[in-house]
Amino acid sequence: MSEVNLKGRKVTVHDMCLRDGMHAKREQMSIEQMVTIATALDEAGVPYIQVTHGAGLGGNSLQHGFAPHSNEAYLAAVCGAVKQTKVSVLLLPGLGTMRELQSAYDCGARSVHVATHCTEADTSPQHIAFARKLGMDSTGFLMMAHLNTPEGLAQQGKLMESYGAQTVYITDSAGYMLPGDVKARVSALRDVLKPETEIGFHGHHNMGMGIANSIAAIEAGASRIDASVGGLGAGAGNTPLEAFVAVCERMGIETGCDLFKLMDMAEDIIFPIMDHIVRVDRSSLTLGFAGVYSTFLLHTNRVSQRFGIPARDILVELGRKKMIGGQEDMIIDTAMTMAKERGLLKDATAGVAP
């Protein structure tokens, strides 16, 4: 797979089960499930785990869905249960607030991904600076990275670094990129960032490229990799952590994780709680192929049934329109327009929930 000798390379793994995995669970995860998963990850030697609503701090909303518990309740329970693992949170400026970040810190979170669209790093300076003030491990998280050029992403990453980000992430939110795309973007970042600023990669498995793309990122200089046990996450899931760690062991890349414990955890804990099999299927593959935000999958499946338009057709149109995270309302708008054009919808209000 790799033309570069990566033997001895150290990589910090960040598990996404308890945040990105919330999307696959329609935000319906109990505190008991959270604690069980977090404890197993801790015992397997995973250094970082992310815990919030799928949309991050402030995510409980009509648009993003309501979890049965607050972020604070989840965080307090998980932070109180783990011994070695550090707990992180996701924060999207404009959705999550600095007050909520302070609350997360008070609950025990010590790391944060401050996430923006790949062209909007300039919305993050206050949140990154506040995270640094709290003493948190602070990451700038550039989402939908395929929609910006390597050079453009490098400049966005440089901005985040200037605000205080200690790590900058290339985030393949759509699972669209191929290894060459990842290498080009990570290399461009590495060329402009300070040597001490780390680079991370967050992949989705929509085209089955999560592991290959993560290895490509490491080849180009990334030292932090997001993944999820069992691939539990939006779309076809995140890079499956246990498979990624197995590949790393074969290549001599050091993760510090216990492979067999992760394998057992995927089989015994994660797979049984899945509401549906998180895999590459017709719809999730279309997400990757069309470059659509991975969290749109379940929303689109529901809208497809309501309007009688194949989910694949809706996703392709959303990709053509370059819709991004936060524009979930456009799924309904797009499906309604397509239904009208196909003569499936006479009444402009038909199919709209009261």
From Swiss-Prot:
PROSITE patterns on file: PYR_CT
Alphabetically ordered keywords of this record: Aromatic hydrocarbons catabolism, Lyase, Manganese, Metal-binding
GO biological process: catabolic process; L-leucine biosynthetic process
Binding site for Mn(2+): 20, 202, 204
Reaction(s) this enzyme catalyzes, per UniProt: (S)-4-hydroxy-2-oxopentanoate = acetaldehyde + pyruvate
Site (Transition state stabilizer): 19
InterPro entries according to UniProt: 2-IPM_HCS-like, 4OH_2_O-val_aldolase, Aldolase_TIM, DmpG_comm, DRE_TIM_HOA, PYR_CT
Entry GO MF terms: 2-isopropylmalate synthase activity; 4-hydroxy-2-oxovalerate aldolase activity; manganese ion binding
Signal peptide extent: none
Superkingdom field: Bacteria
Active site, per annotation: 23 (proton acceptor)
Domain Pyruvate carboxyltransferase, first and last residues per copy: 11-263
Family: Belongs to the 4-hydroxy-2-oxovalerate aldolase family.
Protein name (Swiss-Prot/TrEMBL): 4-hydroxy-2-oxovalerate aldolase 5
UniProt source species: Dechloromonas aromatica (strain RCB)
